[in-house]
Each structure stands twice: as structure tokens, then as C-alpha cells.
């Protein structure tokens, strides 16, 4: 029998597939089969949104079309029969017309690296197809499933807000004041100074949204749905069979025939299990358009919903129902809605089904606890007939008597209405407020006897605290008949803690936090019910006090908004001079249309091979044997490369290409599998058998490294003044320490490379996503034993880097190049997200120990600090990180007597490397923690102590570099004024006095960020500029475009210097073929150094062409170029900048390592929930000295994006390792970077007026890194709020600071009667699931 055809449409074009592989997902099909590369691979698990596309389905029963976003990485193509798929390429392009979403995303400066942009565009596009004038709530909800690492989200919101009603207005729903004009407490915003800045974009330029111009749903698909008789479709391959029944009878028959086969609707549960856990299902049953699975039946008793309805459809249905029915009947519906608003992202909610969510019974399911306490029932069907079972705790535990039978199908779910005197509540706490699995969640229900406040029924279930949803049935039974009072609450907490238990080594860790949440949620429920009883019987039940009422309010954001104050262009500047103007990122349009080409978007090369790595599963072990035989026998496998193949080219410094006889970390490269397809290479890698023998010692933490004296080199040290003598005169001395956790780069584009042998003279071309093409060129040449001039490295753009695409990228490129050279064929290597996070180290975990002497007035007179960074298993950049940390640790403060020492620790973790800020975010936090503790001891505010100790005039740093701190202090004063510090600090105190369970905090942090690379050689740069006879110019330089807009700025430089329109200047990318011997792009100096080289090349050309131009001053560049050609005058010039004068002598502890300093200050105000540890950034004000901004739009983007990345570092980004050194957090489901829900509700960014710096490019300053540190203003604002909570509870003295300040750490620091109730495990009595490193 011939297999059925798969018929669907993509971007209006018909697609027919006769031989469908059921294991094929839509993402690789679009990218490889249809060459639609605008849809990106970001994580492969539906967690980042980079692969978002829109699916449209026609319903012949309702004659309606449903448009919804999905994650293409989790969408099997077999599920697409009869659908229309729209990708970013299908809505607009540069060749025809742009869609308004694409235009506005680009012109509102909403792209940086651009890798996430197509996903953002498609999420917004899908929203507009359903809601042409969305509300702000709908907008933020639609983008909740999309991650961006570069922008900080604010410009994305700005772009999308232009489609909202009244451009995002809330219609005065909040305090009667427009959301766009709100300031503090609804007053008119930001009145101080009222400086005006030119708009970064003009809405008048935007084309209007015209829904009539969208792609129509294919009429053919409508006809098929209307007229074609329904028939089960079966798609199969050698490994898998996909069955798509189209009637309920066929579905029941298929389930009877294949009882072990899972029924999937959205593939959001089965898909990740298949991809990440290696689960394989030979048969999958996927119902398609079965009406009975989508029923909506509302009666007086409740609601019956089809099991096939998507979670987003359920959300819409419940939203409609709660608006129509009395509140007392909709308790369960409202609780479900509360969780549906934060459950996953819009894409997953549109894919996942209600039935799938229930039957999967995941331990952290948000809906199942609520459905269970709500007495829901499940309607089942099999060949034996219909059956109804309760959705009970026994069902969730998969007890045989209460479970589905293998042949049964879940058809629908009955959700009863709540009754009078019945209350249902939902609770959850996650690492991030939205699109994050719950750490603990709960559903709770109570029914009282009529009017008496005496418990008649009680049901409490928890998720996240066991292998499945766990109930407190016995506790509830014992509480029946008890009155609803504090005595009952106290008893309930103790009973529940005794019944719902967690072992100290429970999977997921956070055991004490989870125990605390169990009873914190119970307390919240107690208060919510009291509030409900008050509504039902106001005369009998008193109102909650303000102190208690604060426990009930969730930390929801208001609508996001911002103000920007940047620099005006001088009125004397020529209109055509682009310097200082907010020019759009020149790849912005291509980002938004999907036309921007990244490394893995490059077309396949003839006979291309694919490489994947086998990595170590042990942290410190001897390799006993490697068995390749089984893997080599698999079809399509071409070769497996080990260290033996590389001969003597195995080690570069402390970095090893492939492990030889030992492995030193989990994730170390052991061998590389080469096959004719990516799938076959990955399958074969699983069959490589490596036998290990563990070695001692296993060193994972800094403390263990100190114990074993495991350091890479001897200490680095800087000292000024006489520290020991100064301690003798100090009024007080304190000692403390702070641990700062690591951070994953989480660039959206994973490590990617394509190596192409040229077939002549051993030449080889490397197309790679890197910051340092020269380094790759050198290592590949050494590995292949070629001269460097035969190895060329090309980089068009990089989808984010942040320091993470240097060292390990070069290692992987060398191995890939070896494979390509050996086989004479192109080899492609692209890491999956989990591989990338496992192999490549991130920011260094850090430990700072300080001893500080100070006077009673807050003056710090002596400081002795030890810095330790966890370098991992090889040196990489660790020594430089420690050196930069020591050089920059003073931040904004003059410490007259200072000793700082640092060590890079060797451990058995993947080598940590550079990450935006390069040691300063850690070292600066150590200093600020010390200053904060001094303030507490002195009874002063931290801001007072900061002001007292700050550099203020011309001064010397602790390494004897002179600088002027006038601008630093100006930033500080300006920030204190603009943020209305005094008034708001008073308001925070008033709020805290009135609220026991919510607390607010404020912190203002200064910034002095040194910019420089430490030596002249590392700061040199070159450029090449050609002028063609048509008057156009081509510029090449050594910098890498990775989102910061360096190419845009270089074209601005050429335009100014040559007085040539920017439209006449082009830049193709970066290549060692055009500009050799480049330095790495990083350290905030890429535009500085390369811009000066480009400027030099332009000035060389102008000097050369000056006689020609002076003879024809009214001519055009076309005229001048032709004349130059006729006169044999070269139209090409090399520009060169030798580097800033930089030096540091570590033996003497002095030097001039930095060219200039970036100054700034940030004030953040936060609110915390003392019962859950949740926090919300209410407002952030940032003031920056940027010199003279070359492009304010790009510079604001750098400051804002860096701040949000820093905020993530200090609050929610938490790496988790096992005690054996295995990284648990290998993707966005386990590792949380900030999402839209995390950004400040208000954000105000101000640039100081231009200041002159003669040595830099047009007096500009590099801003790529400095803003990261300002994110710690949120950290210290949280600290301030926690301290207020502790003071109110009578807890004095400091508490141990660690970063990040996650919900767990915040909650456990807010000690109260609930934290005292929980059982504690004795240290050493158990093996923890995870450890801090």
C-alpha cells in the first residue's frame, strides 16, 4: 500500500510529501528541505521562541479559521495535514514589501544580534491576525514565550505597542491616570529638568496595518476539509508509525489495536521526552479535527471541555465564563485562569491540549492540583464503552484502580461549578514569573457548613514536591469540623508538614525552600478564605488588617513604559553627517524578515558531512577504553576522530582538543563522529562506548580548590597605602564574604561552523560564529600543519556572543577542520543548546573575602580583600578575569589603604571564560557588599557611605593611574535627583511599615568602569576601504558584528569622513582574507579601535584624492572616482590604529592599563513577597556618561540590554551542578534568563551631555559591558527589602549574602514562624541533589 500524501501549505505555496518521516519536525523541514532559514533553532525544546511560526487551521463545522503561534522545533510535520504554515519569510521581505510588524521592529531599534527577531515577529504577527488592535496585556502575553539576550525587551515592547489601542494606552484603568503618563503613584512622570531629546523613531513613518493584505487561507484546504470524506492517515518510516484518526470511532479502534501508543495532540510532552530523555515510541496516535475532543458544554452544574482543546482555548473559554457567571460559582475557573496566565508561553499553550496536560501527570503540572481539588471527572471511551472516573490524587499517582486503562481514550473533562461557601485557590512559585516550571504549586479548596465557618470539606494538593502531584488527604480529614481560625492554621501547617515530606536529597534540590512554600501557600489560602468569608458575611467576619492583606496581592507588573534622555546633535552639524544620530541597525530589516544569514543558514555544500561530539560523562577520570565499533557500523557514519588521529596536535596551552588518557570535567570533548546527516551523527554518538575509572581528588568548588591549593598560577596582588597600620586606627573592623554564582552566556545562536576544503594547496575556508577569527585561523593552521595564509576565516554576523565564542569555538573549529581536511569534504558542526551549555563554560563563579576597617562616620580607612574565581579545568581567560577583577574592584571608591589579592582556581568543571564585564561584575559586587555592611554597622544608609567614600576630583586609582572623577560624581548626583531618592525612600519606609508580608527596597549604585585591553598590541586594529567607479564604497574591518551595531557605526564613520551617503557604503562581513591579524572583538572597544582604523583609511583616501576633489568641488564621488582611475590613483586604502598606550606591571602593582572610564549610576526599587521569595522590579533609573554618542539608539540598546543581563546574573540565573560535577541546567527549561515579565515596570535612561575625549573615536565611549554591573542595584534593593522584613521580625545582624538572590534565597532570608516550623536535615546526613559551585 502506498503511503498517504502529506498535504499542507507554507507561505501560500502548496507542499506535498509522499515519503514522510514521522520523526521529522517542522523546524529542520523548513530549514533544510524548503531552505526557509528565517526560522531559527534556539533550544529545540520550545523554551525560547526563536523557531516561532504561525499555523492556520480551518474548522468546517464552524466555518472559521484559527491562527496560532507554535514552536516549529516541537511540531511534527505529520501533524500539519490540511494546515497553512506561515514563516517570517511569508509575511514580507526586502524584495517586495515589508509587513508592518517587520518594519516597526526594525525602525524601533528592537534588534541587536537579530537571532531571536524572526520568532518575535511571528509571535506578534499571530497576535495581530487574531487581534488587529491588541491590548497591552495581550501583547506581553503573546511575547511571553520568546527570549532575547541582547535588547532587554523594552524596544521590542515599544515597537509592538504601536499596534495597540491608542498605541498601548490602558484607557485610564489604573488610578484614572493614563499608563503612558504614570510616574510615582500615578503622578505626572519624570518632571525633573524636562530635558528633551529627539525621538528615536517616528510613528508617522510607519505603514498602517491592513488586515485585508494578509495571506489568505488556501481555498484548496477549505475544499478538502469540507468535501473530502474523513479517513485515518498513516505515515510510517523504518522506525516509527504515525496514525492520525479523524473520527472518534477510528481513534478508539487505533487505541484498542495499539494500547501502548501515546495519544498526542501538541507533542509538547512526548516531544521533549523523545528529544532530551531518549524515549522512543514506535507508534504514535495523533487525532486530527475530531469534534468530540473539542466540545464546549456549559450547564448549571459546570463546564465540560473536550480533551483536545488547547490550553490557550481553555484560557479563552474560562475568561468568557467567569465574566458571565456569579463569582461564587466560578472559584475553580478563576483559579485555573490564574495558572493558565503564567503557564509556559503562548506557543506551548496553543499546542498543548487539556487532555495531554492531565494525562501526562507531570510532577510540576500547574492545572492538575486544581482540577483534582475541584472534584473534576474524566469522561473515558473504549471499545468496552463509556466510563467516568474522578480526577483524584489516586489518578495522579497512577493507582491502577483509578487510572485509564491502556485501551481508553480521554474524551472530555467535567469541571463543576463551585458552591456557596466554597473557596478554591491556586498558588505557584517559579524561578521566573512566567514561562517557567513551578518549583512548588498547589491547589486548595474548602467548603464550609452553611454560614458557620466550620470546615465541611477540605482538599489540598501540591506539585513539585514528589514524583507526581501529592495530596494532604489525612491532614485534611483531621481538620474537618474545625473552625477557620489561627489555631486551625497552626495545626494545619504541622499536619501538612508531617504528611507531605521531602528527603534532603530530593530531586530538584531547594528542599527547605519547598518545605517552606508548602505552609506559606497554606497561610495565603487561609487569608484568601478569610477575605472570601468577609465578602459572604461582612457582619460576622472582620476585615483583614493591612499587614495581612499584603500577603494576598500578587506581584503583577503594570504596563511597561520608559523615558529616554539622550544627546542632541549639534545644530551646526551638517544634516548628512550621521554621527550622533539614532540610525537604525543596518541589518535590522534583514533581521526582521529572516533574510539575515547566520552561519548555519548557509546553503548545504555538495557532499557535506556533519560532525557531533562525544563528551565526557565524568568530571575527573582515566579513560580506560573507547569502543567505536558499534557506532562505526551504523549507516551513514563516515569516521570517528579521536586524539590518536590528531597525533601531536592535541594541546594548545592548557587546552586539549580531544581527551587523550584523562578527562578533567564533564563535557570535555572525547571524540568526534562524522556522518552524512546530522541525525545519523547524533545517533552514532550515543553508541560510542567509553569506559572510565574515577580519579581523586574531585574538585568542584572554590572552597575545595583552596583546601587542595589547586590554583593555575601564583597570586596576583595590588596594594596601596599601609593597610596593616590603617587597621590599627579604625573605629571598627568587620570581616565578611560573598559568593557569586556563574552565568551562562545564553547567546541565542549556538556554536556553529562550516569548514570547506578548497581542494588545492591544502587551502581551507572556515565559516564560523566567532569573536576571534584570527585565533581560529591560527589553531586550525597548527592542527593541520599548514601555514596560516592557507586558512581563511569568515564571519558575516554572530547571533550573540558576550565573550563565549572565542576559546572553545577555536577548539571545535580545529577538530571540524581536521575532519574536513582528512575527508576532502565540507563538514558542518552546530551544537544543540544542551551540548553548548555543557561544553562551553560561562562566567566565573567567584568568592570574595574581605576585612574592612572604618570610622564611625562611614569612612573606610583600610580594606583587605581576597578574590577567587572558579576557572574550571583549563586556564582559558581565568587569569585575565582575576587581573581585571583586581584592577576594577575599587569601582567608584577611594580606599586610601587597600590590599587586594586574587587566585584563579583549577577545578573539575568545564573551563569558565569571558562573559560581558570580564570579572568586574563579580569583583564590583564584592566591594559593594562590603560597603553595604559598613553602612549597616554605622547605622547609615548605604547611599550615605557610598557618597562619603566616592572618588570626587582628580585622583589616583590603587594601581596609580590618574583620572578625574568629576563626571562620576555628576552621574551620582544626577541619578539621585532624577530618581527622587529622598521622597521615594520615605515612601518605601511608609509602605514597609504598613505591610508585613510585602516589603520594598531601594538601592543606588555608582559605576566607574575602566575601558582598555591592558596592552598596546591587544588594542591594534586595521581596516580596508575601497571606492568603486560608480561612487560606492566597500569597507572591511577586524571587528565582529554580534549585535552591538559595530558595522552600522563603521558605515557612519565612512559616511562622515568621506561625506558620502550611508546608502553608498557597504560592509560584507569580517574575514581574515581582507583584514588579517585581528584581535578578539570584546572588551567594549570594538567600535573604538576599528573605527579609528576605518577613519584612518578614509583620511588616507581623502588626502590622496584631495587634488582631484579640489579641482571639482561640486562633483560627485562617481566623478572623483572616475578621474582618479583615469589618473592611476589608487582608490583603496588600508587604515591602521596601533592601539592605546596601555600597560600594567604586576610586580610593581602599577601602570596605565586603561584608556578611559565609563561613569554611571543606577537606582532600582523592588518589591518582594516575603512568603514566596518572589520579587518585582518596580522602577530603575540609569544615568550614564557616554562621552559623545556615535549612535544614541544603539548605545541605549547596549546600556539597557547589559542592565537586564546583569539583573539576571544577580537575581534569577542559577547554574545547578550535581555533586559529581554534572551540569543539570542545560536549556531554557532549567536555566532562566530574564523574560519580558522580569523587566522594570518603569525604566528611565539618561545620557549626560556630550563630553570631549581627544583620544577616542569622536569622543565616544564603549558601552557594551559597563551596564551589566548596574544590574546589582536590583540585588541591593532586594537586600534592602529583606533587611526590612528581618528587622520587623526582630532579627538583627547581617545575613550571608550570595548571588544570585533567587526566590529561594529571598524567602529563606525572610525568616518567620513558617521557616521555623519546617524540619531541617543535619548536614552530612544526606547527599544533596545539587551543590553551589
UniProtKB/Swiss-Prot annotation:
GO CC list:
cytosol
EC number(s) given by UniProt: 1.2.3.1, 1.17.3.-
- GO MF assignments: 2 iron, 2 sulfur cluster binding; aldehyde oxidase activity; FAD binding; flavin adenine dinucleotide binding; identical protein binding; iron ion binding; molybdopterin cofactor binding; NAD binding
Q: Where does Mo-molybdopterin bind?
A: 112, 150, 801-802, 1042, 1083-1086, 1198, 1263
Chain sites annotated for binding [2Fe-2S] cluster 2: 113, 116, 148, 150
* SMART domains named in the record: Ald_Xan_dh_C (SM01008), CO_deh_flav_C (SM01092)
Reported tissue expression:
Expression in liver (at protein level). Also detected in heart, lung, spleen and kidney.
Its annotated compartments are:
Cytoplasm
Please give the coiled-coil regions recorded for this protein.
none
PTM Phosphoserine: list the residues.
Answer: 1063
The catalytic residues are: 1265 (proton acceptor)
Annotated FAD-binding PCMH-type domain residues: 235-420
Instruction: State how the cofactor is bound.
Output: Binds 2 [2Fe-2S] clusters per subunit. Binds 1 FAD per subunit.
GO BP? lipid metabolic process; xenobiotic metabolic process
Per the record, the domain of life is: Eukaryota
What does the entry's PTM section describe?
The N-terminus is blocked.
The subunit structure is: Homodimer.
Its function, per the record, reads: Oxidase with broad substrate specificity, oxidizing aromatic azaheterocycles, such as N1-methylnicotinamide, N-methylphthalazinium and phthalazine, as well as aldehydes, such as benzaldehyde, retinal, pyridoxal, and vanillin. Plays a role in the metabolism of xenobiotics and drugs containing aromatic azaheterocyclic substituents. Participates in the bioactivation of prodrugs such as famciclovir, catalyzing the oxidation step from 6-deoxypenciclovir to penciclovir, which is a potent antiviral agent. Is probably involved in the regulation of reactive oxygen species homeostasis.
The UniProt family comment states: Belongs to the xanthine dehydrogenase family.
**Identification of the protein by name:** Aldehyde oxidase 1
| Gene name of the record | Aox1
Amino acid at each position: 500500500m502506498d503511503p498517504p500524501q502529506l498535504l499542507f501549505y507554507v507561505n501560500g505555496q502548496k507542499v506535498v510529501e509522499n515519503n514522510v518521516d514521522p520523526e521529522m519536525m517542522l523546524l529542520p523541514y523548513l530549514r533544510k528541505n524548503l531552505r526557509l532559514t528565517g526560522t531559527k533553532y534556539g533550544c529545540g525544546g520550545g523554551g525560547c521562541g526563536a523557531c516561532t511560526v504561525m499555523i492556520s487551521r480551518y474548522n468546517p463545522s464552524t466555518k472559521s479559521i484559527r491562527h496560532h503561534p507554535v514552536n516549529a522545533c516541537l511540531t511534527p510535520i505529520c501533524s500539519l495535514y490540511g494546515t497553512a504554515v506561515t514563516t517570517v519569510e511569508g509575511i514580507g521581505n526586502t524584495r517586495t514589501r515589508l509587513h508592518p510588524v517587520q518594519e516597526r521592529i526594525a525602525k524601533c531599534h528592537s534588534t541587536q544580534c537579530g537571532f531571536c527577531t524572526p520568532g518575535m515577529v511571528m509571535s506578534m504577527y499571530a497576535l495581530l491576525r487574531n487581534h488587529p488592535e491588541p491590548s497591552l496585556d495581550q501583547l506581553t502575553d503573546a511575547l511571553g514565550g520568546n527570549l532575547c539576550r541582547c535588547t532587554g525587551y523594552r524596544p521590542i515592547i515599544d515597537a509592538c505597542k504601536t499596534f495597540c489601542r491608542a498605541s498601548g494606552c490602558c484607557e485610564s484603568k489604573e488610578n484614572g491616570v493614563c499608563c503612558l503618563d504614570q510616574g510615582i503613584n500615578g503622578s505626572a512622570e519624570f518632571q525633573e529638568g524636562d530635558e528633551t531629546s529627539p525621538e528615536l523613531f517616528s510613528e508617522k513613518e510607519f505603514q498602517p496595518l491592513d488586515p485585508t493584505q494578509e495571506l489568505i487561507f488556501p481555498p484548496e484546504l477549505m475544499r478538502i476539509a469540507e468535501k473530502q470524506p474523513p479517513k485515518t492517515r498513516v505515515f510510517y518510516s523504518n522506525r516509527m508509525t504515525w496514525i492520525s484518526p479523524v473520527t472518534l470511532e477510528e481513534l478508539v479502534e487505533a487505541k484498542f489495536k495499539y494500547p501502548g501508543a501515546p495519544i498526542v495532540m501538541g507533542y509538547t510532552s512526548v516531544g521533549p521526552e523523545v528529544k532530551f530523555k531518549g524515549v522512543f515510541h514506535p507508534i504514535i496516535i495523533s487525532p486530527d479535527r475530531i469534534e468530540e475532543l473539542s466540545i464546549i458544554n456549559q450547564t448549571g452544574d459546570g463546564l465540560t471541555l473536550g480533551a483536545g482543546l488547547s490550553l490557550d482555548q481553555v484560557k479563552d473559554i474560562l475568561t468568557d465564563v467567569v465574566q458571565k457567571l456569579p463569582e461564587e460559582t466560578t472559584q475553580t475557573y478563576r483559579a485555573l485562569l490564574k495558572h493558565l496566565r503564567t503557564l509556559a508561553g503562548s506557543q506551548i499553550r496553543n499546542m498543548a491540549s487539556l487532555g495531554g496536560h492531565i494525562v501526562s501527570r507531570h510532577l510540576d503540572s500547574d492545572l492538575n492540583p486544581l482540577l483534582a481539588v475541584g472534584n473534576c471527572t474524566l469522561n473515558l471511551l473504549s471499545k468496552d464503552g463509556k466510563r467516568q472516573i474522578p480526577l483524584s490524587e489516586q489518578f495522579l499517582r497512577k493507582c491502577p484502580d483509578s487510572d485509564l486503562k491502556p485501551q481508553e481514550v480521554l474524551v472530555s473533562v467535567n469541571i463543576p461549578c463551585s458552591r456557596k461557601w466554597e473557596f478554591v485557590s491556586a498558588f505557584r512559585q517559579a524561578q521566573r514569573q512566567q514561562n517557567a516550571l513551578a518549583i512548588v504549586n498547589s491547589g486548595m479548596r474548602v467548603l464550609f457548613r452553611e454560614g458557620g465557618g466550620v470546615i465541611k470539606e477540605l482538599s489540598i494538593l501540591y506539585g513539585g514536591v514528589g514524583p507526581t502531584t501529592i495530596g494532604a488527604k489525612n491532614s485534611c480529614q483531621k481538620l474537618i469540623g474545625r473552625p477557620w481560625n489561627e489555631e486551625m492554621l497552626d495545626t494545619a501547617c504541622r499536619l501538612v508538614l508531617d504528611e507531605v515530606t521531602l528527603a534532603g536529597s530530593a530531586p530538584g534540590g531547594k528542599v527547605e525552600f519547598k518545605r517552606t512554600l508548602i505552609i506559606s501557600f497554606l497561610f495565603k489560602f487561609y487569608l484568601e478564605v478569610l477575605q472570601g468569608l468577609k465578602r459572604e458575611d461582612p457582619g460576622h467576619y472582620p476585615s483583614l488588617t493591612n499587614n495581612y492583606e499584603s500577603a494576598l496581592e500578587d506581584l503583577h507588573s503594570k504596563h511597561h513604559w520608559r523615558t529616554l534622555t539622550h544627546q542632541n546633535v549639534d545644530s551646526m552639524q551638517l544634516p548628512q553627517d550621521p554621527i550622533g544620530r539614532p540610525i537604525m541597525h543596518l541589518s535590522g530589516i534583514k533581521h526582521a524578515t529572516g533574510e539575515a544569514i547566520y552561519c548555519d543558514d548557509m546553503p548545504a555544500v555538495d557532499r557535506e558531512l556533519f560532525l557531533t561530539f562525544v563528551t565526557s560523562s565524568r568530571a575527573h577520570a582515566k579513560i580506560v577504553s573507547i569502543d567505536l565499533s558499534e557506532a562505526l557500523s551504523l549507516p551513514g557514519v563516515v569516521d570517528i576522530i579521536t586524539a590518536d588521529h590528531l597525533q601531536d596536535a592535541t594541546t594548545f596551552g592548557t587546552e586539549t582538543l580531544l581527551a587523550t588518557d584523562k578527562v578533567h570535567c564533564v563535557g570535555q570533548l572525547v571524540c568526534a563522529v562524522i556522518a552524512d546527516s546530522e541525525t545519523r551523527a547524533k545517533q552514532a554518538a550515543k553508541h560510542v562506548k567509553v569506559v572510565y575509572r574515577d580519579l581523586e581528588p574531585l574538585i568542584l568548588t572554590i572552597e575545595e580548590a583552596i583546601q587542595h591549593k589547586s590554583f593555575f598560577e601564583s597570586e596576583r596582588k595590588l596594594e596601596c597605602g599601609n593597610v596593616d597600620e590603617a587597621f590599627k586606627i579604625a573605629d571598627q573592623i568587620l570581616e565578611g564574604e560573598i559568593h557569586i554564582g556563574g552565568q551562562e552566556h545564553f547567546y541565542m545562536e549556538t556554536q556553529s561552523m562550516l569548514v570547506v576544503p578548497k581542494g588545492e594547496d591544502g587551502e581551507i575556508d572556515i565559516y564560523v560564529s566567532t569573536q576571534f577569527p584570527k585565533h581560529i585561523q591560527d589553531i586550525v593552521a597548527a592542527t593541520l600543519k599548514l601555514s596560516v595564509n592557507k586558512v581563511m576565516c569568515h564571519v558575516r554576523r554572530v547571533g550573540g556572543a558576550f565573550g563565549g565564542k572565542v576559546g572553545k569555538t577555536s577548539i571545535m573549529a580545529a577538530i571540524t577542520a581536521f575532519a574536513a581536511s582528512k575527508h576532502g569534504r565540507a563538514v558542518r558542526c552546530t551544537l544543540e543548546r544542551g551540548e553548548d551549555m555543557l561544553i562551553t563554560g560561562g562566567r566565573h563563579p567567584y568568592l570574595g573575602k574581605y576585612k574592612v576597617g572604618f570610622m564611625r562616620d562611614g569612612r573606610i580607612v583600610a580594606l583587605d580583600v581576597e578574590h577567587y574565581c572558579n576557572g574550571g579545568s583549563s586556564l582559558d581567560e581565568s587569569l585575565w578575569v582575576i587581573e581585571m577583577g583586581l584592577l576594577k574592584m575599587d569601582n567608584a571608591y577611594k580606599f586610601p589603604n587597600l590590599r587586594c589579592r586574587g587566585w584563579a582556581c583549577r577545578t573539575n568543571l568545564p573551563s569558565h571564560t569571558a562573559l560581558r564585564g570580564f570579572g568586574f561584575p563579580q569583583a564590583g559586587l564584592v566591594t559593594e557588599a562590603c560597603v553595604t555592611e559598613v553602612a549597616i554597622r554605622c547605622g547609615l544608609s548605604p547611599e550615605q557611605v557610598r557618597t562619603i567614600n566616592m572618588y570626587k576630583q582628580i585622583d589616583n586609582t590603587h594601581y596609580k593611574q590618574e583620572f578625574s572623577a568629576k563626571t562620576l560624581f555628576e552621574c551620582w548626583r544626577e541619578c539621585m535627583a532624577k530618581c527622587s531618592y529622598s521622597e521615594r525612600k520615605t515612601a518605601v519606609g511608609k509602605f514597609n511599615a504598613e505591610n508585613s508580608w510585602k516589603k520594598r527596597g531601594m538601592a543606588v549604585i555608582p559605576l566607574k568602569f575602566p575601558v582598555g585591553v591592558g596592552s598596546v598590541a591587544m588594542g591594534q586594529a586595521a581596516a580596508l576601504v575601497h571606492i568603486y567607479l560608480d561612487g560606492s564604497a566597500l569597507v572591511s574591518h577586524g571587528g565582529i558584528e554580534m549585535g552591538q551595531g559595530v558595522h552600522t557605526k563603521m558605515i557612519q564613520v565612512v559616511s562622515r569622513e568621506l561625506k558620502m551617503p550611508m546608502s553608498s557604503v557597504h560592509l560584507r562581513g569580517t574575514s581574515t582574507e581582507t583584514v588579517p591579524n585581528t584581535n578578539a572583538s570584546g572588551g567594549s572597544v570594538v567600535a573604538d579601535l576599528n573605527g579609528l582604523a576605518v577613519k584612518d583609511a578614509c583620511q588616507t583616501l581623502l588626502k590622496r584624492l584631495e587634488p582631484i576633489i579640489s579641482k571639482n568641488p561640486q562633483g560627485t564621488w562617481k566623478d572623483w572616482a572616475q578621474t582618479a582611475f583615469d589618473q592611476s590613483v589608487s582608490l583603496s586604502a588600508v587604515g591602521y590604529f596601533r592601539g592605546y598606550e596601555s600597560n600594567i606591571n604586576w610586580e610593581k602593582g602599577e601602570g596605565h592599563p586603561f584608556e578611559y572610564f565609563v561613569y554611571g549610576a543606577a537606582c532600582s526599587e523592588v518589591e518582594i513577597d516575603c512568603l514566596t521569595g518572589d520579587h518585582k522590579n518596580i522602577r530603575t533609573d540609569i544615568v550614564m556618561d557616554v562621552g559623545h554618542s556615535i549612535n544614541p539608539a544603539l548605545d541605549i540598546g547596549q546600556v539597557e540590554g547589559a542592565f537586564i543581563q546583569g539583573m539576571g546574573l544577580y537575581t534569577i540565573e542559577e547554574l545547578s551542578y550535581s555533586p559529581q560535577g554534572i551540569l543539570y541546567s542545560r536549556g531554557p527549561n532549567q536555566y532562566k534568563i530574564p523574560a519580558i515579565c522580569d523587566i522594570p515596570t518603569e525604566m528611565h535612561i539618561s545620557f549626560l551631555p556630550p563630553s570631549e575625549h581627544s583620544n577616542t573615536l569622536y569622543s565616544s565611549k564603549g558601552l557594551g559591558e559597563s551596564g551589566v554591573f548596574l544590574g546589582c542595584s536590583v540585588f541591593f534593593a532586594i537586600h534592602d527589602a529583606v533587611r526590612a522584613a528581618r528587622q520587623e521580625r526582630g532579627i538583627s545582624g547581617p545575613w550571608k549574602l550570595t548571588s544570585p538572590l533567587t526566590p529561594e534565597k529571598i524567602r529563606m532570608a525572610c525568616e518567620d514562624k513558617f521557616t521555623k516550623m519546617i524540619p531541617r536535615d543535619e548536614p552530612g546526613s544526606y547527599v544533596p541533589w545539587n551543590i553551589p559551585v
